[in-house]
């Protein structure tokens, strides 16, 4: 599948974010401005290298949300071609992402592509999972955006491999405190499966049913369902709608055992 853009960019100095689907369901997000690119969670390197080189782009930085192999697997190979690129990752994951060059913690702010990026600690899927929030860029007239890895998915959330339901509940609530129009760039295309599960659980929910129809239509055309938005997740994501960590834990257990 070809990489797709989420912003029409007539001016090379305007930033845009592009999707590069790889493996079975991973999405590598590529944020570009001018001739510079920032790559988020490169599962593998070769498609990224080809995409950047074809467009004569230089890799400025890699953003890592967490340590899983399908998120960091391509980073070292990319660094062989762009040795000066920064690798941003959680300081608490230095033992598992030892090649990081910029170690960050919750609420840190860094500058990339002349934009401010805020780090958000969103543990749950893993103990040191982080997200990267890009506020509205007035120069680009873009909506805010968040690269959230495997914490928040389209109509879902990540499995609790290292964290607790309480961790995930707090992480999702934190993400949903971002502006409603914030675009959600998660790392896997799971939206349709998540909505099928949610619709089976709540067949009377019109918002979920309507989103499922829309997403299914997109997927049948070979299009992605992402990015989503915070407002969309607040309307149709059962994990986001959970009232407390106990309810989230019950939903997570049900989803883990569910078979379409």
Swiss-Prot record:
Keywords of this entry: Hydrolase, Metal-binding, Zinc
Pfam families xrefs: HAGH_C (PF16123), Lactamase_B (PF00753)
SUPFAM superfamilies: Metallo-hydrolase/oxidoreductase
Pathway annotation from the record: Secondary metabolite metabolism; methylglyoxal degradation; (R)-lactate from methylglyoxal: step 2/2
Record's cofactor remark: Binds 2 Zn(2+) ions per subunit.
Binding site for Zn(2+) 2: 70-71, 150, 188
Family stated for the protein in its record: Belongs to the metallo-beta-lactamase superfamily. Glyoxalase II family.
Protein name: Hydroxyacylglutathione hydrolase
Organism of this sequence: Prochlorococcus marinus (strain MIT 9303)
């Amino acid at each position: 599948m070809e990489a797709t853009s989420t912003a029409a960019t007539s001016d090379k100095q305007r930033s845009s974010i592009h999707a590069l689907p790889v493996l079975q369901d991973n999405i590598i997000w590529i944020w570009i401005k001018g001739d510079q690119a920032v790559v988020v969670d490169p599962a593998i390197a070769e498609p990224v290298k080809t995409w950047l080189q074809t467009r004569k782009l230089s890799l400025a930085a890699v953003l890592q949300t967490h340590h899983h192999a399908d998120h960091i697997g391509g980073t070292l190979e990319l660094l062989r071609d762009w040795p000066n690129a920064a690798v941003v990752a959680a300081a608490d994951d230095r033992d598992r992402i030892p090649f990081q060059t910029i170690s960050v913690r919750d609420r840190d702010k860094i500058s990339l592509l002349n934009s401010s990026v805020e780090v958000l600690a969103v543990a749950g899927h893993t103990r040191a999972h982080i997200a990267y929030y890009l506020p509205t860029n007035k120069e680009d007239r873009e909506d805010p955006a968040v690269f959230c890895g495997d914490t928040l998915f389209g109509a879902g959330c990540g499995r609790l491999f290292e964290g607790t339901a309480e961790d995930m509940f707090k992480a999702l609530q934190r993400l949903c405190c971002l502006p409603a129009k914030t675009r959600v760039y998660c790392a896997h295309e799971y939206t349709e499966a998540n909505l099928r599960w949610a619709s089976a659980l709540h067949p009377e929910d019109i918002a979920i049913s309507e989103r499922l129809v829309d997403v299914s239509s997109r997927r049948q055309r070979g299009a992605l369902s992402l990015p989503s938005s915070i407002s969309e997740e607040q309307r149709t994501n059962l994990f986001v709608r959970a009232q407390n960590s106990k309810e989230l834990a019950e939903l997570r257990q049900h989803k883990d055992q569910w078979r379409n």
